[in-house]
Amino acid sequence: MERFKKASSIIETLKQQGHEAYFVGGSVRDLIIDRPIGDIDIATSALPEEVMAIFPRNVPVGLEHGTVIVVENGEPYEVTTFRTESEYEDFRRPSSVQFVRSLEEDLKRRDFTMNAIAMTEEGKMVDLFAGQEAIQQREIVTVGNAADRFQEDALRMMRGIRFVSTLGFSLEMKTKQAIETYGHLLEHIAIERITVEFEKLLTGTYCVKGLKELVETKLFSHLPYLQMSEERLLKATQYKWDSFETDIEAWAFFLYCIGEEHPSVFLRQWKFSNKKIKDIVAVLLTIRTRKEKDWDTVLLYKTGIHIAEMAERVYEAMIERYDPTSVERVQSMFHALPIQERQEMNVTGNDLLNWANKKPGPWVAEMLQKIEEAIVQGNVVNEKERIREWLQGCNLL
């Protein structure tokens, strides 16, 4: 409750000015579940311009949606006016937002009952839709009619399955049936928004449970490159997913599990950045080599510690060994390398030109590569004169 206490002065100030105000959303849910608290959000009957007048230190980030960031005690908090939404367009966004003075009207537009609980600054719960009961039953239940909620915003179906993965809850029967019925509406949603939810699914503590729900509801059949992947997705549920430390590892393992032969094409369809695609593909390529042989100095040096650590964790999951010392061994080997990157070499192309008395050309880069490999393999000490002597001894100068 300590973090809520820091923000409670905002609620107290709003109430002193004659407005209602409550803590709402995921932070209240996580407090009840006893999970780490994320961002703390506040809902109020005050209109955005009233909030801005009361709190001079503010950032009007989303006035059309009624949201103002208020800075209090050095911390930013989202303060949003109670609102209701009109008909939705394209199954993803409301055609208009109306500000209201009713907490109930605000809460009833939310996706799931566990996310529709408000809390006073004293810690009293305002639970109009049995959200606490759903949490106690470990169930994900829509607020009101599931069909209506999913037709308003089809992304809520992915959010529901994401919560299965992150919380370990189960989909309530009618909620699950509605996902099966309206799953096709997900095709109206921008893939970038789906990717965010799917990544949270893959990195959730209960990822296997989430993937099973993805299959059982048939929602996977409306996702890019997964339309015919039921058996491959079920294969992915046979592994443990709790040893990964990054989203890169989770995606690499997922692509391995489903046997994706063209990972770059798959990831581009999911709108990943070039950097992220490069890292995921690098992990997959490293695993392919790792399956054939153990780490050696050259492989580790060329791979780099960042990719090597991730690849080793994924490899451990693949062979179902889960030995934490394997990554420690990789780290020890890497730190014992004579050099860890080319910039650490104590010789340059100019040195080679001076020693050989030859014109510049491709031979310089080729020679530097040979020296680099020799240093990494321990065949020559990384000192300028020792390198020159080694080159002369190998008749390379």
From Swiss-Prot:
Superkingdom of origin = Bacteria
What residue intervals traverse the membrane?
none
Q: Which reaction does it catalyse?
A: a tRNA precursor + 2 CTP + ATP = a tRNA with a 3' CCA end + 3 diphosphate; a tRNA with a 3' CCA end + 2 CTP + ATP = a tRNA with a 3' CCACCA end + 3 diphosphate
User: What's this protein's family per the entry?
Assistant: Belongs to the tRNA nucleotidyltransferase/poly(A) polymerase family. Bacterial CCA-adding enzyme type 3 subfamily.
The family database entries (PANTHER family) matched by this protein are listed as: CCA TRNA NUCLEOTIDYLTRANSFERASE 1, MITOCHONDRIAL
**Known function:** Catalyzes the addition and repair of the essential 3'-terminal CCA sequence in tRNAs without using a nucleic acid template. Adds these three nucleotides in the order of C, C, and A to the tRNA nucleotide-73, using CTP and ATP as substrates and producing inorganic pyrophosphate. tRNA 3'-terminal CCA addition is required both for tRNA processing and repair. Also involved in tRNA surveillance by mediating tandem CCA addition to generate a CCACCA at the 3' terminus of unstable tRNAs. While stable tRNAs receive only 3'-terminal CCA, unstable tRNAs are marked with CCACCA and rapidly degraded.
Could you tell me what this protein is called? CCA-adding enzyme
* Name of the encoding gene: cca
